């Protein structure tokens, strides 16, 4: 990269920085001070730069955006180790686990799915399919007919989205940041508590940070006042620019809370 400043041309490289100007001086790794222009350059060797770059890459790689699309989750998928942002390969991710891990994760997924409104799913599994077992399909067993599996094509949108969120929390690397778009989409409002409890439990157990978006006042009410420091809301100014605001910094928050819940504040267009 080259930067031209007044009469000097600065060339940036991973090993060195050269200053090519009137004097024709070269600068090698170390420290260079241009007192005339009040510029200080500190340069590093390649290993340090590569290590720093690797840390940045690892940080961004551990940011996972999840917006499950039930229509795509109902199809067969390839067995793979990383969950796609649309959740379409949930079954493949489960099948890629070791037999012990797969059994454990499926048991946990099943335990969190049971309280859903249908209350008839008692087990969720994923199985390889096809001649060479390279694809996978999601199945569940219901109380209505314990011997007859139901594949993903027979599951509701809310159930599939919920399963994708649970699988993501159970399989992403610790210390990841999981961004979930419309976290309660398709889920019955009466199960907001189960959703919040699941997010709190698994994020704490797996040491995963979770950032969710929602337009559901019921879910906001379920979070409770203790979560106010962790809630933000988005507004737009007269130019149409969006701004993220901390709820705890809202003016007259105590007065607003005295007249209703967080969800009620949203319904009344107070936030």
Model-derived regions, located:
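Electropositive, glycine-dotted interaction segments
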Residues: 1-125
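Phosphate-binding glycine-rich loops of NTP-binding sites
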Residues: 8, 89, 157, 161-168, ...
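Short, Φ-rich (hydrophobic/aromatic) sequence segments
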Residues: 55-63, 170, 183, 197
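Short small-residue beta-strand/loop micro-motif enriched in glycine and branched aliphatics
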Residues: 93, 146-151, 242-243
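Conserved ABC ATPase signature
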Residues: 118, 122-170, 177-190
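C-terminal lobe/lid and adjacent interdomain/linker elements of RecA-like ASCE P-loop ATPase modules
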Residues: 194-271
